[in-house]
Amino acid sequence: MSTSFQEFKAFCNKVGLDFQWLNLQSSKSVPENGSSEGFSAVSDTVQENIRPATEPLNVNQSKDPVSNFFYDVKNAPLWNVYKRNHSGHSSAEACSGVSSRQAPKNIPEAMVKETVLSNHDNVTIINELLPTSSAMHQEESTAMTTSYLLSHSVNDTCNVMFSSSSHNRAMLPSSLVQRNNATTSPTTDSASENNESVPSLTSSVSTSSSVYSSWNPPHSPHISSFPDGNFASLNAEVTCFDFRRTKDSRTKETNESIIPTEIYCPTNSTDHHKHYPSRKSKQDACAPAPCNQNISCSVVSTAEFSQSNHTLTTVVPSYMQQYLDRPQNWFESKMGKYCPLFLRSTKNIDYDSLEFKFERKMIAVQYLLLDEQSEPRRYYNPSNKSIPFWKRPFNFDTMPSYDQLMEEAECRFYSYQYKYEGFQRIEPYSISCPWKNTQREIDLVLDHIHFSLDVGEKKSLNRKGNITLDTLDSKVDPNIQIKPYQIFPSNNLVYEGLPHPAEQSLILSPDTSLIERAFQALIDICKESIPSSNDCSTRNNNSAPQLTVPEPSKPCRLLLVRESRTATELKTNKKLWLHSQRRNIEVTVPMHPSERGTKSWLRKWLSTFVHQ
């Protein structure tokens, strides 16, 4: 067993997949004339049994090409598909080896006959319900498709023509698909109603944001299957594994994750073209299509499966960088959200884009922090129509808490309509009507809460947890100080651009919690404000070596003085600023690089004025 196949089995066990392989062994050879009598002779001597996926493969295989062929076939799935002969042999004659006497006792004869009669079309199908009744038949123009083949190649088996489907499709009629669904498991009753043939492995797949891409071993060519065009996929979702979330979801279709995995067996195409020269031009004309991958999940933190070392590597999402590098003119950079529409360079916005969803997520985070760290906030709202009109100019409403917004979103879960969706014109923040901005922020938080519920996280959504697609890893620090809510202008929950490089870590590292990222950004700002000290004296090479003790660097203290609201606070501030030991206190304030010259000149002027 090759190393790549062992790694694939380890990957399947990690995800939770379990396969049953078909074991075929035979000692007789396949006749070269391709007659139908040879198929029955081979079918009588074939012994089939189901081997568990954990049993190791037998590497000590014989040198006989026919036995090597059956050794390669024993890892094929239970669905075996082959073509009808062009020379006039019917599909019933090709399946003469499959009869009712070979069927197991628990399968009635009517079902076996129905299986044979249903194979009068271009495709001959052996049902999965007959695990011990089928044998692989091979003709000159007969091809076999398998979903999974051995990843190592055997040059002796090149005399037998077989190919691997690049799309991992299984050819099953709808009648057999429905019959297979009825015998899967009690947990897949809903899947049988939608004609889904593969059971959902809900108990073994987590709902994390990590995404495994389709596994393809290196240096494995994509071989196009059935270039003659006589096959048509009756059910395109037969071998695609339907992973459903274990949590309550709104619909079954929105929470599906289809993860196709394929293994291809590299074969010697030169020998195939020698034996089948007519197929060379047809295979060259049919280009292999790439493997389809349809994965619906959150894209806050994506993970790719590296083929080199087969480890998970976290990739920074592109929408975060696009949010930082969004185009802005001079008016937008100065006025921010309050910039009028006629002064903007970009006048339209896509509310369904990832950039806007990320901004909406940050607004929800700030709303939660303000709700936890401050008292119920009141804001001026003269547009409330539930009160008499003569009271509206003097009306102050209380902002709803985050718990109230969650309850409202859950009550209106099936009838909720997004306030901001689609491609629309930008709605600037109002300067004269700040209550409209506050109401807009509440609507954005409601949209984000409903979006988090809609992707299948209704049960795990709580007040301090999954308000975003990536959860807050740690609880909010209760000692954190947040600026009190301002009535005008309403710029409390507006998430503006991030000019400082230290603040960009709030976006570029989504694995850490919000408080840890904010604290690390503050440390980075303080480190950049501290000048580099070169207190260590330079070493003289001519003199003897000496031990130099560097002088301790001066401590950097960050002094925060809030505004004086009472007489006691005013007196305290006066004592602080007029104290004789004030010179030993160094105040370090981060500032923009363009304003450092002005700030230093202003600080010198103020210090001279205080000394005088």
Curated annotation (Swiss-Prot):
Residues 176-203 are annotated as: Disordered. Residues 176-196 have a biased composition (Polar residues). One of its GO terms (cellular component) is prospore membrane. GO terms for biological process: sexual sporulation resulting in formation of a cellular spore. To yeast YNL034w. This is Uncharacterized protein YNL018C.
